[in-house]
């Protein structure tokens, strides 16, 4: 399929790597094949929608978060920047479109998704032929300029989850239009062909023709002006007839006498003229019948005194190729019913996915609350254990103080008991010493 049949829109990215300008990537968008997908991508390139879902709906400032050499580079996550976010201009996601297009060459622009009918804002640019993605991802454009920039991004060093180590950012983006479309807007009305196949100057002067053309507002205004002009001409003719009526009545008598004289001269020729007139009249009737019975090119019989002849040249635009393709897609009742069933099944799957996602979110929220409660219980338990340990330590310290005080009291009692004993023992010692001295005296006396 030639490029002009696939589409005629252009978009561009200005890329920077680690803050340094790397170049521009220009895309050719296939708006005739995938109009909804192209409009989604184009709106994010221009940023014309402003803020949506709390984020600025534009690729400007977003990054290429995933790079796989020999496969593709991926970007377009305008919310999180890591491949988990993004949304479409039609809502959260939108359905797949024209999955018959193949990934049969490198540097194609395709939509990233998380399954059937989950397209958002993320996209990827292939660097090789990837037939295993056919029927799963929607191809809606190709790179026509800036292949070297794509190769430079592809050859960058990557880390965890194929994220490039260097920051690859879209610093500027937008839609490209042809210079003729911009310059020619001022004179578009003058240079634009008339919207009908019949021009006003081509119309016959008689009112006994059946004309078919689209009644645009301009043609209605011109018709009103022509009607007003015809009325003025009719009034002028009526006034001139009134003015010259008297002269005609005065000349009518002389003209009637002249006609009577000429009638006698023509009497010999009446036979021949009558036959010729009858032949001419019959020929005109046959031609008129032929014109009446002749249908149009489309096979439609037109009421009136003649067939359409003032069609003019083909100045209108040709039928777009995507219209022709749609007109050629005539479906049978069974095919239409099958398509409706597929659409219903797709809607059911989408509803089921939404339901599962809601259940998953509810489950995650419940688990989060349970984990929070569990952490709170563990914290309370730890505080209770610390309080119990503190109480036990206080009790042990009190017991130690009591034992220490009781031990010191018993020692004091023992010391008090020992002092009287010492006092009682000292007189005994003195008496024993005196007795020993007396015994020694007695022994000396005996000697």
Swiss-Prot record:
Keyword Coiled coil among record annotations: yes
Region of interest called Disordered, as start-end residue ranges on this chain: 186-447
Ranges of compositional bias, category Basic residues: 235-254
PROSITE patterns cross-referenced by the UniProt entry: CSA_PPIASE_1, CSA_PPIASE_2
Catalytically driven reaction(s): [protein]-peptidylproline (omega=180) = [protein]-peptidylproline (omega=0)
Pfam families recorded: Pro_isomerase
Function: May catalyze the cis-trans isomerization of proline imidic peptide bonds in oligopeptides. May play a role in the protein folding, transport and assembly.
Name recorded for this polypeptide: Peptidyl-prolyl cis-trans isomerase 8
Organism classification: Eukaryota, Metazoa, Ecdysozoa, Nematoda, Chromadorea
């Amino acid at each position: 399929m030639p490029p002009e049949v696939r589409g005629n829109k252009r978009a561009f990215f200005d890329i920077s790597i680690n803050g340094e300008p790397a170049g521009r990537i220009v895309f050719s968008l296939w708006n005739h094949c995938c109009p909804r997908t192209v409009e989604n991508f184009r709106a994010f390139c221009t940023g014309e929608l402003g803020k949506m879902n709390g984020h600025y709906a534009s690729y400007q400032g977003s990054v290429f978060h995933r790079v796989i050499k020999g496969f593709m580079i991926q970007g377009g996550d305008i919310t999180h920047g890591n491949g988990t976010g993004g949304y479409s201009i039609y809502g959260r996601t939108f359905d797949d479109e024209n999955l018959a297009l193949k990934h049969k060459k490198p540097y194609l622009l395709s939509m990233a998704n998380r399954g059937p009918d989950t397209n958002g804002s993320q996209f990827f640019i292939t660097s090789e032929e990837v037939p295993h993605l056919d029927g799963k991802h929607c191809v809606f454009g190709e790179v026509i300029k800036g292949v070297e920039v794509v190769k430079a991004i592809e050859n960058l060093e990557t880390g965890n989850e194929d994220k490039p180590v260097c920051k690859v950012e879209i610093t500027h983006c937008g839609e490209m239009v042809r210079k003729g479309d911009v310059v020619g807007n001022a004179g578009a009305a003058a240079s634009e062909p008339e919207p009908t196949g019949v021009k006003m100057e081509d119309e016959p002067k008689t009112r006994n023709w059946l004309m078919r053309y689209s009644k645009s507002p301009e043609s209605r205004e011109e018709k009103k002006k022509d009607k007003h002009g015809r009325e003025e001409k009719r009034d002028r003719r009526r006034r001139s007839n009134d003015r010259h009526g008297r002269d005609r009545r005065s000349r009518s008598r002389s003209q009637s006498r002249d006609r009577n004289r000429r009638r006698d001269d023509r009497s010999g020729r009446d036979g021949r003229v009558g036959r010729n007139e009858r032949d001419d009249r019959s020929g005109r009737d046959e031609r008129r019948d032929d014109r009446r019975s002749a249908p149009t090119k489309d096979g439609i019989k037109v009421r009136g005194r003649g067939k359409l002849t003032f069609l003019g040249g083909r100045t209108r635009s040709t039928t777009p190729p995507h219209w022709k393709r749609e007109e050629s897609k005539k479906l049978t009742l069974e095919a239409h019913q099958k398509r409706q069933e597929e659409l219903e099944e797709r809607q059911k799957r989408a509803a089921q996915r939404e339901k599962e996602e809601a259940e998953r979110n509810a489950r995650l929220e419940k688990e989060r609350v349970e984990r929070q409660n569990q952490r709170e219980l563990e914290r309370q338990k730890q505080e209770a254990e610390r309080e119990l340990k503190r109480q036990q330590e206080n009790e042990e310290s009190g017991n130690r103080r009591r034992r220490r005080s009781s031990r010191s009291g018993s020692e004091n009692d023992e010391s008090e008991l020992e002092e009287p004993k010492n006092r009682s023992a000292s007189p005994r010692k003195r008496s024993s010493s005196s007795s020993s001295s007396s015994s020694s005296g007695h022994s000396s006396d005996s000697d």
